[in-house]
Amino acid sequence: MTIIHPLLASSSAPNYRQSWRLAGVWRRAINLMTESGELLTLHRQGSGFGPGGWVLRRAQFDALCGGLCGNERPQVVAQGIRLGRFTVKQPQRYCLLRITPPAHPQPLAAAWMQRAEETGLFGPLALAASDPLPAELRQFRHCFQAALNGVKTDWRHWLGKGPGLTPSHDDTLSGMLLAAWYYGALDARSGRPFFACSDNLQLVTTAVSVSYLRYAAQGYFASPLLHFVHALSCPKRTAVAIDSLLALGHTSGADTLLGFWLGQQLLQGKP
């Protein structure tokens, strides 16, 4: 039996003492899921991590990833979670992946949107963010504004569109939620019912994406997104933070940055 000690865990990750299934084995992440849709992700060190995640050392993650067939049944044991011949122990160190809205938020400058990285649905980032916005993005932003104003919104119409484990529109909505929290337009009280009128989101998008979106509505975001908003107040760090954000997934980073830009424009009162 090989014992794995996580380096770090998110304090908002679900309680590991419940029944899990192996939901996906990837180069940088291993997903475990409950019947109710709770997600626990084992992340490879150096790849950032999400609000439902534990971070494993590179060598230990690679050994675990390479040693799994994909059909193992996770077992909860006294020390942690057993996966095949590996036991991932309960983490000892935790951190809070929740945004703290700054007193004086610094906006994302328009120049940072002049990037060639591809979004999932609207071409290069520079084109997707240019005026006039594509009609679909204008409608998406209008729907987000209505939701912030308290209008009951069924997000199933918008989610699940585009490629990826977290589809493009889902990432764009995550970016808009990040902007809303950053600028103080959402808080714990207003964020809690954000998806209340959306029924079962897993009917239209992936379970992984649903988990990230529900966390985002409550102000919990993956570490690269938090690094990005922190870096907006420190010009020396902004370029590196944006590069790290844009490196996420195939188009996830670009779609998220596009969403933040759309949310920022909305909250600054720009048409």
UniProtKB/Swiss-Prot annotation:
Q: Which pathway is it part of?
A: Nitrogen metabolism; (S)-allantoin degradation
Q: Which InterPro entries match?
A: AllH-like (IPR021530)
The protein's Enzyme Commission number: 2.1.3.5
- Effect of deleting the gene: The deletion mutant cannot produce oxamate during anaerobic allantoin degradation. However, the levels of oxalate, produced via a glyoxylate shunt, significantly increase.
Q: Which reaction does it catalyse?
A: oxamate + carbamoyl phosphate = N-carbamoyl-2-oxoglycine + phosphate
Name its co-factor(s): Mg(2+)
Q: Where is the signal peptide?
A: none
Q: Which GO terms describe its molecular function?
A: transferase activity
Q: How does activity depend on temperature?
A: Optimum temperature is 30 degrees Celsius.
- Pfam families to which the protein is assigned, alphabetical: AllH
pH dependence per the entry: Optimum pH is 9.0. No enzyme activity is detected at pH 6.0 and 7.0. Activity increases in the pH range of 8.0-9.0.
Extra remark beyond the main annotation: Oxalurate could not be used as a standard substance due to its unavailability, and the enzyme reaction was performed in the reverse direction: the synthesis of oxalurate from oxamate and carbamoyl phosphate.
Q: Which family does the entry's similarity section mention?
A: Belongs to the AllH family.
Record's subunit section: The OXTCase is composed of 3 subunits, AllF, AllG and AllH.
Protein name per UniProt: Oxamate carbamoyltransferase subunit AllH
Question: Organism source for this protein?
Answer: Escherichia coli (strain K12)
